[in-house]
């Protein structure tokens, strides 16, 4: 592999360096394994669609906590010298890039890459099994970073973010030539699909927002013939059952809330139920005007029911 190393001089420059490439942080989307990004979103992003570079609370937490995780690793693995990575690494032929969080020096095996993560307690237990394992999407990220930097090994440090106990787990990710070949093959296939205009199948659990980009408006008078779709009738029946169940739950919820209000009458709050905080207060809502806009509305009804 021919690898380019480009020094990072600022965040905007770094973001621009990443734009032409599939990067290690999202390569798992090509395997349907990324928790936030799908192959379709990646395809659209590299087909001219501009997405906001949102810096949400989770990303901000990870960025701010990154030095703390590295410090914790230094305390637990005193033989390692941890160095912040200041460069972007890319294979220009494959258009695959990576920026490891840190490099590890001082290990007898040679250079290592360190990926730092933070996790809420329930995520730490559910996805990381209490620090015993690394989620598949993170494994793919670290394997890509190690491959592009020609590191001897990779490691992941995850810090459980808890107000009273900042537990740290360090899990090594060995180089895996077969897995690395699969990563390279998936990236090469992705770029072939982009060039040929072959759109990946959507991930229905992640891609709802992409419909606003793909089909923001209907073409008046057009129809789509789904008579050959054998799966859809059963799914529509399933949806009908779910909607009926939701209506039943909502009706019962309203009954319980009405009963509670009658018991409270003009009281502002409830005492005597130590497990529950209940109040019924008046709230002033300012007048506001909703700006006009066109919104596509999906309506489904069973033709055998009125």
Language model features with spans:
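Accessory terminal regions of nucleic-acid processing enzymes
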Residues: 1-306
């Amino acid at each position: 592999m021919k690898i380019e190393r480009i020094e990072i001089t600022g965040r905007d420059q770094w973001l621009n360096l990443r734009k032409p490439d599939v990067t290690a942080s999202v390569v798992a989307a090509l395997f349907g394994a990324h928790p936030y990004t799908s192959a379709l979103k990646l395809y659209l992003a590299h087909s001219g669609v501009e997405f906001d570079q949102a810096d949400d609370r989770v990303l901000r937490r990870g960025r701010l906590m990154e030095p703390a995780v590295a410090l914790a690793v230094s305390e637990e693995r005193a033989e390692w010298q941890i160095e912040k990575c200041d460069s972007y690494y890319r294979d220009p032929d494959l258009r695959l890039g990576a920026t490891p969080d840190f490099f590890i020096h001082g290990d007898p095996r040679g250079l290592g890459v360190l990926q730092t993560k933070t996790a809420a307690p329930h995520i730490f237990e559910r996805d990381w099994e209490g620090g015993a394992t690394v989620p598949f999407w993170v494994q793919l990220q670290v394997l890509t970073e190690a491959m592009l930097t020609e590191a001897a090994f990779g490691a992941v440090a995850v810090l459980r973010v808890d107000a009273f106990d900042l537990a740290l787990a360090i899990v090594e990710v060995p180089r895996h030539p077969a897995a690395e070949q699969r990563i390279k093959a998936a990236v090469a296939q992705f770029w072939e699909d982009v060039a040929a205009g072959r759109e990946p199948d959507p991930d229905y659990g992640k891609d709802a927002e992409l419909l606003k980009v793909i089909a923001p408006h209907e073409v008046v008078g057009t129809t789509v013939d789904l008579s050959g779709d054998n799966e859809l009738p059963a799914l529509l029946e399933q949806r009908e059952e779910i909607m009926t169940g939701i209506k039943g739950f909502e009706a019962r919820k309203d009954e319980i809330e009405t009963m509670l209000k009658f018991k409270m009458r003009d009281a502002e709050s409830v005492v005597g139920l130590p497990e529950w905080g209940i109040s019924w207060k008046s709230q002033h809502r300012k007048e506001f005007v909703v700006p006009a806009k066109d919104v596509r509305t999906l309506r489904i009804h069973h033709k055998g029911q009125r």
